Amino acid sequence: PTEVYLQAFGDYASGRYQSAVLGFETFLQRFPNNSYASNAQFWLADCYFNQQQYALAIPQFERVLNEYSAAAKNPEALYKIAIAHLQLGATDEARQTVDILNQRYPKSKATQKAQELVIP
């Protein structure tokens, strides 16, 4: 399983997001309970985010939160959801997401970054 994950992450790190999406999806289908699964889900979502496919990124980041509630990347997932909502013009959703981030993870770096977001 580690090999599949590392190949997908290598594609992600090199900006080959479409290949990375396929790799992370394969990893998650084959090894859903692996210790790397929460990271794979986050990076899968981030592939869509980095391609500015925000409507696809949001539900993938939400899966990080819903399926891996203790994942270390949850604050960053919420931050990226807020940015994706902003990019889609959904300011109310962005504001709500930042509020959730503040409540759940008040001392995280993602929360600090979210304070700098300008939400109209």
Show which residues each predicted segment covers:
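Alpha-helical segment of the N-proximal tetratricopeptide repeat
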Residues: P1-N33
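Short solvent-exposed coil/turn linkers within tandem alpha-helical repeat scaffolds
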Residues: R30-Y36, E67-K73, N102-Q112
